[in-house]
């Protein structure tokens, strides 16, 4: 079944019941008439272990440029939301990223709860999960507990779930379609409301993952590409697969002209434009 269906159809498929508070928040996040999501992640943190990225050294300035581009939502860590979001409160739906982790398990911490997200006025609660490997049970347990608590506050849970491979004994992200499909199924069975998984690089394979999921699938924006055109082309393929949109971080604020970058991704996600047409439309 396609996950890009209008929300009432998704509710019917999944049993027809959803609390009003959660429905209101999901409708704000997926508020565009396309039914898809173009969101921006501003949550580059210690897990990347590569210092402060130039595009996020001044978070309020970055937010100002991003908001001008009119994304459908912005994802932030709880501390930055408390200190930098007031100026933009109500302008764009806020999603609180709660997790701080590293792929090799050298860090795993929850910085926020669903209640924290509600108190900050957020419309979504994001939580990261790593599957495959000896510690996947621990991540799944944290997600399951968050889903239970989120139900009390009627806030949707957006699970950022990433499969790992251990070729050569070193943990790396896996982009194999079967691993991504497994990750998506894990998230669905844990009861989350939206699943964010990496794009596997193949439209047909990703379309199968989307079709198999009873929950909306959105794509992760992925590592920074060589140029903006490459990132836009990848997201264009995501749209072709039938996914419900994407969340982009480094490929928005990692290049110059941040506001125009957001508009270009919006054109691809909401208007179905090619990378070339989106670049022309936004003057990039």
Positions of the model-derived regions?
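Short acidic/histidine-rich active-site segments
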Residues: 244-253
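Thr-Gly-centered strand-to-loop micro-motif
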Residues: 220-221, 248
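Alpha/beta enzyme core
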Residues: 39, 44-46, 51-74, 80-89, ...
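C-terminal helical cap(s) of enzyme catalytic domains, especially alpha/beta-barrels
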Residues: 239, 254-284
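N-terminal amphipathic alpha-helix/helix-capping segment at the start of soluble metabolic enzymes
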Residues: 10-43, 82-91, 281-282
């Amino acid at each position: 079944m396609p996950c890009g269906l209008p929300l009432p159809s998704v509710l019917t498929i999944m049993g027809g019941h959803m609390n009003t508070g959660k429905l209101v928040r999901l409708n704000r996040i997926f508020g565009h008439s396309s039914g898809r999501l173009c969101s921006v992640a501003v949550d580059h943190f210690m897990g990347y272990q590569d210092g402060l990225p130039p595009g996020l050294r001044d978070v309020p300035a970055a937010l100002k440029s991003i908001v001008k581009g009119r994304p459908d939502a912005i994802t932030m860590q709880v501390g930055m939301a408390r200190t930098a979001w007031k100026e933009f409160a109500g302008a764009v739906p806020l999603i609180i990223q709660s997790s701080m982790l590293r792929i090799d398990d050298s860090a795993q911490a929850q910085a926020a709860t669903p209640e924290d997200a509600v108190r900050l006025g957020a419309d979504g609660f994001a939580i990261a999960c790593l599957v495959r490997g000896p510690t996947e049970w621990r991540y799944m347990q944290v997600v399951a507990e968050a889903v239970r608590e989120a139900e009390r506050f009627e806030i949707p849970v957006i699970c950022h779930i990433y499969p790992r491979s251990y070729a050569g004994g070193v943990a790396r992200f896996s982009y194999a379609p079967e691993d991504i499909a497994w990750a998506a199924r894990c998230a669905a069975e844990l009861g989350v409301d939206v699943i964010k998984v990496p794009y596997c690089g193949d439209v047909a394979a990703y379309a199968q993952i989307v079709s198999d999921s009873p929950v909306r699938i959105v794509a992760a924006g992925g590592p920074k590409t060589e140029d903006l055109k490459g990132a836009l082309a990848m997201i264009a393929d995501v749209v072709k697969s039938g996914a419900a949109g994407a969340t982009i971080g480094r490929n928005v604020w990692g290049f110059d002209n941040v506001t125009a970058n957001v508009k270009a991704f919006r054109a691809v996600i909401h208007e179905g434009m090619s990378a070339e047409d989106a670049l022309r439309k936004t003057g990039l």
